[in-house]
């Protein structure tokens, strides 16, 4: 997988993959990702940092690598995406202790760095679009993919 495709996957769609496999009866939608749309990839990276990185790490991706791949100056990444004193050469980890996360969520949220490589881009896209309100679940939502 080329660098742009990896960045597209990270920036566009890294969200919980969990350990379970996708159900065989779930139709996977095609993810039409334009890896040449750098602005979209940059917005995806910002969304990932703002909404996912609080619980999910991306421990195999460095901030500096993301900045290089998304044509972002490192100081812009530090000013806009790094809020806890991280260094630009560090990997994207979370401060939440795994034991606390397991207590709060039932298990620690998985690292998302390699999710697209493991499950595929279409799985991620379908997963993101498959949430629905389910009052019977502890968090009030469920997903058709698993």
Functional labels for PLM-detected ranges:
Residues 1-35:
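Post-cleavage N-terminal segment of exported redox proteins
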Residues 12-15, 19, 78-79, 96-101, ...:
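Intrinsically disordered, low-complexity boundary segments flanking structured domains
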Residues 22-46, 57-68, 77:
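Electrostatic cytochrome c docking/interface patches
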Residues 51-59, 63, 132-135:
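A generic secondary-structure signal for well-formed alpha-helical elements
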Residues 104-146:
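Thiol/selenol-based redox catalytic cores and closely related redox-interacting motifs
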Residues 46-58, 94-98, 108-119, 123-126:
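C-type cytochrome heme c attachment motif
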Residues 39, 75, 119-122:
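Generic alpha-helical secondary structure signal
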Residues 66-103, 107-109, 115:
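Structured domain cores in non-transmembrane regions
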């Amino acid at each position: 997988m080329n660098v742009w495709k990896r960045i597209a996957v990270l920036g566009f769609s890294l969200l919980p993959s969990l350990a379970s496999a996708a159900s065989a009866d779930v139709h996977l939608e095609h993810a039409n990702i334009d890896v040449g749309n750098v602005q979209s990839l940059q917005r995806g990276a910002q969304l990932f940092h703002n909404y996912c990185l609080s619980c999910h790490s991306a421990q195999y991706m460095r901030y500096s690598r993301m900045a290089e791949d998304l044509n972002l100056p490192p100081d812009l990444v530090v000013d806009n995406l790094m809020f806890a004193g991280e260094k630009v050469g560090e990997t994207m980890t979370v401060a939440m202790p795994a034991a606390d996360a397991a207590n709060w969520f039932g298990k620690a949220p998985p690292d998302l760095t390699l999710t697209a490589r493991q499950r595929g881009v279409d799985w991620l896209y379908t997963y993101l679009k498959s949430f629905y309100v389910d009052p019977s679940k502890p968090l009030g939502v469920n997903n058709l993919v698993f």
